[in-house]
Regions:
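Bacterial N-terminal signal peptides
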Residues: 7-16
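Amphipathic/hydrophobic helical signal segments and adjacent flexible N-terminal regions
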Residues: 6-7, 21
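Carbohydrate-interacting regions of secretory-pathway proteins
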Residues: 19-206
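Positively charged n-region of N-terminal signal peptides that target proteins for export
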Residues: 1-4
Length: 206
């Protein structure tokens, strides 16, 4: 069993680094082994994160709250690529610069974007232009680019935001300093979510 777990972890790590290596300019944000380069948003928060097979898992039981993970490094203009998986009705978020939330929601059964939100929405700001969610238990892929105050997002191969101007924080942000660099922030206080293959390419300042 220990050998199998070790093999799974090694394979997961190899896969995460291979993605970045095959994409010129991209670097891995998560090494597949530990949370080096990341920190808890709240030191006193319940640690709901674990790592298994190169996957970063946030497991939150009903009635509980986890804690958010934030990169130590801050960024300005960049393209970020990642994969995530959620159960039905689970709720999480991926924050650009720690202030602009790309909503993660297990809403596949609804068959359409929620009014003003839903999976892939810029939370509290702009709903996705198309319904691109996959069923619970399937890996979903995202490419998000932020340049200045403009955000472009492709979810599962469909462009759902194209140069959307977002000049304000969208809620639960680390701070309101939208004109300054900020970290990547994985929301962990709402629901169960899994991430893998997080990688980024920093872009020139606008």
């Amino acid at each position: 069993m220990k050998k199998l777990l070790l093999l799974t972890t090694v394979l997961g790590f190899a896969l995460s680094t291979a993605f970045a290596a095959d994409e010129p300019g991209f670097v891995s944000l998560f090494n597949g082994k530990d949370t080096d380069g990341w920190k808890s948003r709240r030191a006193d928060g319940h640690n709901s994160w674990s790592i298994e097979g190169g996957i970063l898992k946030n497991t939150v039981n009903k009635g509980e709250h986890g804690t958010d993970l934030v990169t130590n490094k801050k960024f300005w203009n960049f393209t970020v690529r990642y994969e995530y998986q959620v159960p039905d009705n689970s709720n999480s978020g991926f924050y650009l610069r720690g202030r602009h939330e790309l909503q993660i929601l297990g809403d596949y059964k609804s068959g359409k974007p929620s009014k003003g939100g839903g999976n892939g929405a810029i939370y509290n700001h702009t709903a996705p232009s198309d319904f691109a969610s996959k069923p619970a238990g399937e890996w979903q892929t995202v490419e998000a680019t932020i340049i200045g105050n403009k955000i472009t997002v492709t979810l599962n191969g469909k462009k759902i935001h194209d140069g959307v101007v977002c000049d304000k924080a969208t809620g639960s942000e680390i701070d309101g300093k939208v004109n300054e660099p900020g970290p990547i922030f994985l929301q962990g206080d709402h629901g169960t979510v899994w991430f893998r293959n997080l990688r980024m390419k920093e872009l020139p300042k606008d």
